[in-house]
Amino acid sequence: MKILIMGAFGFLGSRLTSYFESRHTVIGLARKRNNEATINNIIYTTENNWIEKILEFEPNIIINTIACYGRHNEPATALIESNILMPIRVLESISSLDAVFINCGTSLPPNTSLYAYTKQKANELAAAIIDKVCGKYIELKLEHFYGAFDGDDKFTSMVIRRCLSNQPVKLTSGLQQRDFLYIKDLLTAFDCIISNVNNFPKFHSIEVGSGEAISIREYVDTVKNITKSNSIIEFGVVKERVNELMYSCADIAELEKIGWKREFSLVDALTEIIEEEGK
């Protein structure tokens, strides 16, 4: 099977590439070069003929992991380009191919943030044009996935690294409940979804998470206990965002129906991550 990974140098994209490349022919799509990357087959969107190169590759599966979260005060146009225009541009370009386009979306409601809004708009546009495309479109409503060596701007990683270095952690009330999914479990979920693509309709949405919601407080306390940290945890000193979502949890019935099963508990996953990052 031929798989194109959009956003191949990102946290999720790079791990998907490593996970699939031993069993499939994998090519990555990236905006700019990364000298530290170990991925060999890359199409760069800075090249004039990057669309033509995708068509020449003739992927069976396209996984879009490209995302702009707006965490670094990026303008709205940056989020629109990354979260809407890029996936729709690729989807339209492969309209003649019998390929499956898997878009990594979010479980967050569109009024939560501009990121969530633009991600949802991409799916709405895809639904409007999917009848003109030979293949399929699958939207993944991803919950909060995490793993070793994710970006410093990710909540899960920030807490781990501050606890490892015994730095104070300033947070909101911590009463929000989130569905945390370990990256290794997410990769096997992708495997199950790809193995069952023929059973899905032309446009389809799947919720992807652990199926268990825990509070931010419980997550932070678990990290602190495993790291044996001396960090001072300050709940309630950070103001909650406007439209803060207080509960989010995936309904994983469909994932379980196609054979997926979560393997790592929160404690097991965090123990593994902390061992890797603490070396």
Curated annotation (Swiss-Prot):
SUPFAM superfamilies, alphabetized: NAD(P)-binding Rossmann-fold domains
Pathway note: Nucleotide-sugar biosynthesis; CDP-3,6-dideoxy-D-mannose biosynthesis; CDP-3,6-dideoxy-D-mannose from CTP and alpha-D-glucose 1-phosphate: step 4/5
Pfam families hit by this protein: Epimerase
Organism superkingdom: Bacteria
Catalytic residues as annotated in Swiss-Prot or TrEMBL: 115
Catalytic function, reaction form: CDP-alpha-D-paratose + NADP(+) = CDP-4-dehydro-3,6-dideoxy-alpha-D-glucose + NADPH + H(+)
E.C. numbers: 1.1.1.342
Gene3D superfamilies with a match to the protein in the record: NAD(P)-binding Rossmann-like Domain (3.40.50.720)
UniProt GO molecular function: oxidoreductase activity
Keywords from the named record: Lipopolysaccharide biosynthesis, NADP, Oxidoreductase
GO biological process, one term: lipopolysaccharide biosynthetic process
Family statement: Belongs to the NAD(P)-dependent epimerase/dehydratase family.
Function: Catalyzes synthesis of paratose and tyvelose, unusual 3,6-dideoxyhexose sugars that form part of the O-antigen in the lipopolysaccharides of several enteric bacteria.
Additional information: The functional difference between abequose synthase and paratose synthase lies in the side of the pyranose ring from which the keto group on carbon 4 is attacked in the reduction of CDP-4-keto-3,6-dideoxy-D-glucose.
Protein name: CDP-paratose synthase
Gene name of this polypeptide: rfbS
